[in-house]
Amino acid sequence: SYDNWELLLMDASPEWDAVSDLADDANDERVRRFELPGNGGIVLNTNACIQQATGDYIAFLDHDDILEPDALFRYVAALNKAAEGERPQVLFCDEDMFQKTGEWGQPVFKTQLNVDLLYSHNCVTHFLMVEKALIDRIGTSPEDVAGAQDYDLTLRCLASGARFEHIAHVLYHWRVHPGSTADGSADS
């Protein structure tokens, strides 16, 4: 496992105690909670968290999804393996779905970046980790891309000439539930 991380929790609904309880229960100074005056939606909430991040890289994790315990270790190993000046600026991995039944399924085994495929759909998706200096340079996502903010960020990273690296392990489990994008329903 990897110990040098911080977890930023954006509490856009402070009237509910779930996020503050989670931060308190963690009892770990690496877990930091921030409160917004109102729920600005996924893009504004994400952008506010990005502004609070202190690390060299920012990894995006949805509130209801699951990471393998060695995910950060594998990403950092890829960074450390690369020569200085050649480090990847955008990292992503294979993923699967965690079904409502409690079963794992539908693995997605990706390849190194395929630009043509990326222009047709978001073949990078999860577990997206981006160099903070790159985000500072290209900016955060605009509010009008809500629901596709990860894709927007990935495309803007590509347009900037960023170096991408695929980590060939299933490290991210996308939880399927009614209304989630993973569910494929019209409501998501």
Task: Give a label for each model feature.
Residues 2-38:
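Acidic donor-binding segment of Leloir-type glycosyltransferases
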Residues 12, 62-66, 94:
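The conserved acidic donor/metal-binding loop of glycosyltransferases
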Residues 36-53:
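Glycine-rich, basic loop-to-helix element that forms the pyrophosphate-binding segment
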Residues 43, 51, 98, 104-133:
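A recurrent flexible, glycine/aromatic-enriched loop bordering the glycosyltransferase active site
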Residues 58:
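Short aromatic/hydrophobic "clamp" motif used to bind/position activated sugar donors
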Residues 70-105, 177:
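Conserved donor NDP-sugar-binding/catalytic core segment of glycosyltransferases
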Residues 146-153:
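Acidic donor-binding loop at a coil-to-helix junction in glycosyltransferase catalytic cores
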Residues 164-171:
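Catalytic beta-strand/loop signature of glycosyltransferases that borders the donor
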